[in-house]
């Protein structure tokens, strides 16, 4: 092909020859940067709220953004302030994960402080996820690592781990951190529709950094090398 061919050939008939208006350029930019958010809203099942729950736009936005980060980085911080419904947001993200990975392919572990045990169990039940979930208080993680404890699936069977009040695991030298890190970083023994053997981790906290940036670093080590 020669330069003359380009000038006289069929390439001249493409849209590239036309003038692009500022408006068209703006729309193209929006699609490039935000198309994943637009498409994500089509997955309505995750946003179907059970009776007694209200749907808020900020929660829907948080689910879309959080889920995108979960798939891209294998984990993320859900760090809204107190009272904005982090439990519901995390549950909706877990539901979207189940939809995409396949419910029967998915096992979830929720790690929580004892004071909020009922809240987590009730919310997961309301959203229809309790069948695919085990719940453990943040001081009893050794039970998950005990292969003879049949109240829990083996640690390598979990696909998604949710950690409430994740700032309690900011110290990498204590036993609880070591146990949680082992659970989170133990490869999935089987995968569902979502590929990859790394577990997905959601760290939930209103105060992810209590003292120094080292707090964040240690918590990130729960899902990153």
Give names to the regions the model predicted.
Residues 43-54, 64, 86-193, 225:
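SF2 helicase/translocase NTPase motor core
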Residues 75, 159-160, 200:
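The start of beta-strands in P-loop NTPase/AAA+ ATPase cores
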Residues 1, 169-170, 207:
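Conserved RecA-like P-loop NTPase helicase motor core
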Residues 195-212:
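Conserved helicase ATPase motor motifs in RecA-like P-loop NTPase domains
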Residues 81, 113, 207:
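P-loop (Walker A) phosphate-binding loop of NTP-binding proteins
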Residues 1-81, 88-100, 105, 122, ...:
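ATP-dependent helicase/translocase motor core
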Residues 216-224:
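A short helix-turn-beta junction within AAA+ P-loop NTPase domains corresponding to the substrate/partner-engaging
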Residues 76, 108, 202:
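Conserved beta-strand position immediately N-terminal to the Walker
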């Amino acid at each position: 092909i020669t330069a003359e061919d380009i000038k006289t050939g069929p390439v001249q008939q493409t849209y590239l020859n036309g003038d692009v208006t500022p408006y068209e350029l703006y729309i193209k930019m929006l699609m490039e940067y935000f198309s994943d958010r637009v498409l994500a809203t089509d997955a309505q099942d995750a946003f179907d709220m059970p009776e007694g729950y209200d749907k808020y736009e900020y929660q829907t936005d948080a689910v879309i953004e959080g889920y995108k980060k979960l798939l891209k980085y294998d984990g993320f911080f859900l760090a809204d302030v107190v009272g904005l419904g982090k439990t519901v947001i995390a549950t909706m993200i877990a539901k979207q994960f189940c939809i995409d990975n396949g419910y029967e392919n998915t096992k979830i572990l929720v790690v929580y402080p004892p004071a909020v045990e009922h809240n987590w169990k009730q919310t997961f039940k309301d959203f229809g996820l309790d069948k695919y979930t085990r719940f453990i208080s943040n001081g009893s993680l050794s039970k998950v690592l005990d292969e003879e404890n049949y109240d829990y699936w083996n640690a390598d069977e979990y696909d998604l781990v949710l950690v409430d009040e994740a700032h309690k695991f900011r110290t990498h030298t204590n036993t609880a951190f070591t146990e949680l890190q082992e659970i989170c970083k133990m490869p999935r023994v089987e995968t569902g529709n979502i590929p990859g053997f790394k577990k997905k981790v959601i760290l939930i906290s209103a105060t992810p950094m209590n003292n120094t940036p080292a707090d964040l670093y240690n918590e990130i080590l729960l899902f990153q090398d």
